[in-house]
Amino acid sequence: MFRLSIGAAALLSLMAGEARAQDQNEMVKKGAQAYRICAACHSLQPGVHLSGPSLADRWGKEAGTIGDFGRYTEALKKSGIIWEESSLDGWIAQPQAMIPGTTMTFRGVEDAEVRKNLIAFLREALSTGGAERMVKSGLIPESMATGPMPEDVSSVGDNQRIKEIRHCRDGYYVTTADGAQFPFWETNVRIKIDTSARGPKKGEAVLVRSGMVGDRASVVFSSLADVNQLLAEKC
């Protein structure tokens, strides 16, 4: 009878453990869906910084300490916050209340259940090798793990490589290496700099057209020096 009781207790303990694991897996699965709100500004890939810093391997780490990300606020860098369940719950709920003056433009998640599920996912995704595991398990697509990276313009055709760009009155006038010429209204052009390996080669500018009728464009330079050198005010 005593042996049966021990066996029954062990079985009940095993069943309880399996139930907890199933509950945790379900939370992670739901959290993966909620992660879309984070993926709009962050990457899970190491060293890939977008609007916000990479989240790779940040579980249990101090906030504001990624050396090659320079856009932290002083308040966050001095906060001493360690990223784990309770701190992430407060941050995701009301980032402005937790760190006044933060530049993270995110209104927060009011639903405590959604936050709980999201944090369960982040615990897995923000650990070492988390992005690869989350993609491999089918919880998120690779594109979500990478985040919304800008177009790779390190190698483009003559139809995008800019031969001349000048500003005159209310317009930008772009001539590409294939000889095509495009006049754009000045407010429809975004001047960008991409210093990453995915950006233009030094001394080059790249045209990226957009808009429903192609009337909008980004002009991407590799540095501010190239902007000053290649962009002229000339009519």
Where are these regions (language model features)?
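Gly/Gly-Pro-rich "capping" loops immediately C-terminal to redox-active cysteine motifs
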Residues: K30, S43-W83, I165-R166, T175-K192
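Electrostatic cytochrome c docking/interface patches
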Residues: G17-A34
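The canonical Cys-X-X-Cys-His
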Residues: G31-Q45, L118-L122
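Short boundary/loop segments of OB/S1/cold-shock single-stranded nucleic-acid-binding domains
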Residues: K136-V156
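Structural detector for short beta-strands of small beta-barrel domains
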Residues: P150-R169
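OB-fold/S1-family single-stranded nucleic acid-binding modules
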Residues: M212-C235
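C-terminal capping alpha-helices of c-type cytochrome domains
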Residues: W83-K136
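Flexible glycine-rich surface loops and low-complexity tracts that mediate binding to linear polymers
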Residues: P200-S218
